[in-house]
């Protein structure tokens, strides 16, 4: 079975990369994994790379950007690059952050591995600080980062003006009553229970979240009821969705697997995923929307 060289110097086989999933017969046959495999084998780093369709077709436009195919390329390239890249051009990159990975580096040697460090290792010519927004370490999902100062400035303005649209999907403990609504709570950092936030209507900053119940389901083959919900945050406070879910003045149902605000019931991860991200491209001014449903 074929193996592939990865950016971190490791060599991984297809069964190792796909894990308990069946390895598709065509996996590794596309041009991008082959080119990256050869580059990493020679200890070369790509400066930039894109895939475009050349020619005419009823299904494709000439010079249309082609993201990695879902079935064959994406799992393979995510392992090779240590980043799940959904889109990249000369100005921006959109990635699917895995749970447990920091968005930006923290204090200490053990907190240097993060999305930013992996992007900078893969694209050495990008700016020193490419991040324009963050996800909690335990949250998975979509992040956009900037390669240039111009792109960083333009995207930052969009986040400040709240013209960026974000949607999350989560599993909440128990059965959430109602079809949807809006949660508005004020909260602040709790110095006595780091890194938790605490409800404080006097000194806290207000956060607003729109939510919609998607379905009620069982979880993990157990007699455990959970509710799948969609969140649209209108503000971007630290731990906003986690606290709005768990607090009795919010939904009163913590996110499954939340080590800070949860019930302690077993779960392999925090069941919170940034599933949709929409913004205006900082150079082309085209409105771009990326969607990726969670694996839970």
Regions from the PLM with identified roles:
Residues 1-296:
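RNA pseudouridine synthases
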């Amino acid at each position: 079975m074929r193996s592939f060289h990865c950016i971190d110097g490791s060599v991984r086989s297809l069964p190792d990369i796909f894990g308990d999933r069946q390895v598709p017969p065509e996996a590794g046959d596309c041009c991008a994994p082959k080119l990256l495999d050869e580059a990493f084998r020679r200890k070369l780093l790509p400066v930039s790379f894109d895939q475009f369709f050349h020619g005419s077709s009823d299904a494709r436009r000439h010079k249309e950007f082609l993201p990695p195919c879902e079935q064959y390329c994406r799992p393979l390239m995510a392992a090779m690059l240590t980043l799940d890249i959904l889109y990249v051009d000369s100005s921006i990159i959109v990635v699917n952050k895995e749970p447990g990975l920091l968005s930006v580096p923290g204090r200490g040697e053990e907190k240097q591995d993060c999305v930013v460090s992996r992007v900078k290792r893969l694209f050495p010519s990008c700016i020193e600080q490419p991040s324009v927004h963050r996800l909690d370490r335990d949250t998975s999902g979509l992040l956009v980062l900037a390669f240039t100062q111009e792109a960083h400035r333009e995207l930052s303005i969009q986040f400040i003006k709240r013209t960026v649209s974000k949607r999350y999907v989560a599993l909440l403990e128990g059965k959430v009553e109602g079809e949807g609504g809006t949660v508005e709570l004020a909260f602040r950092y709790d110095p006595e229970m780091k890194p938790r936030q605490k409800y404080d209507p006097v000194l806290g900053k207000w956060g607003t979240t729109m939510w919609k119940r998607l379905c009620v389901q069982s979880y993990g083959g157990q007699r455990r009821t959970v509710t799948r919900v969609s969140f649209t945050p209108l503000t971007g406070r630290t731990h906003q969705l986690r606290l709005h879910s768990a607090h009795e003045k919010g939904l009163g149902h913590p996110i499954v697997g939340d080590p800070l605000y949860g019930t302690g019931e077993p779960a392999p991860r925090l069941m919170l995923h940034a599933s949709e991200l929409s913004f205006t491209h900082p150079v082309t001014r085209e409105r771009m929307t990326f969607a990726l449903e969670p694996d839970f």
